[in-house]
From Swiss-Prot:
Activated by phosphorylation. It comes from Paraburkholderia phymatum (strain DSM 17167 / CIP 108236 / LMG 21445 / STM815). Its EC number is 5.4.2.10. GO terms for molecular function: magnesium ion binding; phosphoglucosamine mutase activity; phosphomannomutase activity. This is Phosphoglucosamine mutase. Binds 1 Mg(2+) ion per subunit. The keyword Transport does not apply. PANTHER family: PHOSPHOGLUCOMUTASE (ALPHA-D-GLUCOSE-1,6-BISPHOSPHATE-DEPENDENT), PHOSPHOHEXOSE MUTASE. Catalyzes the conversion of glucosamine-6-phosphate to glucosamine-1-phosphate. The keyword Ubl conjugation does not apply. The modification Phosphoserine is found at S108. NCBIfam families: glmM, PRK10887.1.
Length: 452
């Protein structure tokens, strides 16, 4: 059964438009609370479950936090409020505090006028599809407030930020520190604006910050992992050794070196796999996505590392990692999973893992990626009407077939619907940039004509 509200990363949309409205989010909190309260762990003991709510810095977070809190309380679920907190911080604290679930109010890399809700299970993982389906089923039932003696209570979690800072630092090798390194940290005016600079500073780095002055409206606005030009300029202007850019909820990153070169998630995955081979002797396999650059796949296979592609979305990378019993996976967008360190993608932890790999090897990122030249990719986002039947369109199919025939095995064509926005993503990868651009633009033109 198709889900009505949950996408690849929770529920997301424009604030004020269904489903991101206070009345719906209150009912969502109630529905999630009823599902949690009915779970075996809590139903058998009769204990009242507790959930943790964190958020990013969007002005709408206050409204949605209050709505969620009310819904959970009406379902008889206690609430702990973490305030502004990176998504991976909520996942960690949920697991560390043995809570029933964690909830994040964020639209990640989207503009301030969007927002969303995503859930984490007690073990710090994103909720399975079947639990999200149970919540959707509960949404169809009437809201029946728990008796007064069973209503949930709410309280602030003291030092949530400090607890998460210590967790992040604990993932960095005790033998290393960052003394002598000048580091620019771009927090996208988002959830990590306070914690990320502290992590790198307390490990010894000379930290220069940008994107650390949230006002409720400037999250991801010209800064952060989706706008890395700001980081490139800051690294060059300050003659820094390296720059790290996080997105609005800090679950992904981009890294820039002293020369202004940008490194994406595909390249950083290769660096981390190399580091594991050097320290452990062997890495059985790694997981990317349908969008992962072919050059990385070839380079990993040349090192004897099996490579598997998952559907786009970090939850699907995680599923493949668990299926194969592996630890390392990534998306080119900068979501990096290292399951021996954390249960979910964490931009701060991922940056520390890359820095540790550089220190262990004594080499720069450019040197660690010698011999790995990414194939040119052209990605075009085409807005379309929700529900448009692009898969069954003959004109689109012909355009794809013609491009694949012209590439003749020296590239790839990938078209997919976004799980978070009403757009169709057209990606072409080729040995030569002009070919990637030509075929992507041609297919995108056909898609626009067919879906408008």
């Amino acid at each position: 059964m198709a889900r009505r509200y949950f996408g690849t990363d929770g529920i997301r949309g424009k604030v004020g438009d269904p489903p991101i409205t206070p009345d719906f989010v209150l009912r969502l909190g109630y529905a999630a609370g009823k599902v949690l309260a009915g779970a075996d762990t809590w139903a058998k003991t009769g204990s009242r479950p507790t959930v943790l709510i964190g958020k990013d810095t969007r002005v709408s977070g206050y409204m949605l936090e209050a709505a969620l809190e009310s819904g959970f309380s009406a379902a008889g679920v206690d609430v702990m409020l973490a305030g502004p907190m990176p998504t991976p911080g909520v996942a960690y604290l949920t697991r560390a505090l043995r809570l029933a679930a964690g909830v994040v109010i964020s639209a990640s890399h989207n503009p301030y006028y969007d927002n969303g809700i995503k859930f984490f299970s007690a073990d710090g993982n994103k909720l399975p599809d079947e639990v999200e389906s149970q919540i959707e089923e509960q949404l169809d039932k009437p809201l029946e407030c728990a008796p007064s003696e069973r209503l949930g209570k709410a309280r602030r979690l003291d030092d949530a930020a400090g607890r998460y800072i210590e967790f992040c630092k604990g993932t960095f090798p005790q033998a290393f520190d960052l003394r002598g390194m000048k580091l620019v940290v771009d927090c996208a005016h988002g959830a990590a604006y306070d914690v990320a600079p502290h992590v790198f500073h307390e490990l010894g780095a000379d930290v220069i910050t940008i994107g650390v002055s949230p006002n409720g409206f400037n999250i991801n606005d010209g800064v952060g992992a989706t706008a890395p030009d700001a980081l490139v300029r800051a690294v060059r202007a300050n003659k820094a050794d390296l720059g790290v850019a996080l997105d609005g909820d800090a679950d992904r990153l981009q890294i820039v070196d002293a020369n202004g070169r940008l490194y994406n998630g595909d390249e950083l995955l290769y660096v981390l796999v190399q580091d594991r081979i050097a320290t452990q002797g062997k890495v059985d396999g790694a997981v990317g996505t349908l969008m992962t650059n072919m050059a990385v796949e070839v380079a990993l296979k040349n090192k004897g590392v099996q490579f598997v592609r998952a559907a786009v979305g970090d939850r699907y990378v995680l599923e493949k990692l668990r299926e194969h019993g592996w630890e390392l996976g990534a998306e080119g967008s900068g979501h990096i999973l290292s399951l021996d360190r954390h249960s979910t993608g964490d931009g701060i932890v991922s940056a520390l893992l890359v820095l540790a790999a550089m220190q262990r090897s004594g080499r720069s990122l450019e040197q660690l990626l010698e011999g790995v030249t990414l194939f040119p990719q052209k990605l075009i986002n085409v807005r379309m009407q929700p529900g448009a039947d692009w898969k069954g369109n003959d004109a689109i199919r012909r355009a794809i077939n013609e491009a694949e025939g012209a590439l003749d095995g020296s590239g790839r064509v990938l078209i997919r619907a976004s799980g978070t926005e009403p757009v169709l993503r057209v990606m072409v990868e080729a040995a030569h940039e002009k070919d990637a651009v030509h075929h992507a633009e041609r297919i995108a033109t056909v898609v626009k004509q067919a879906t408008s």
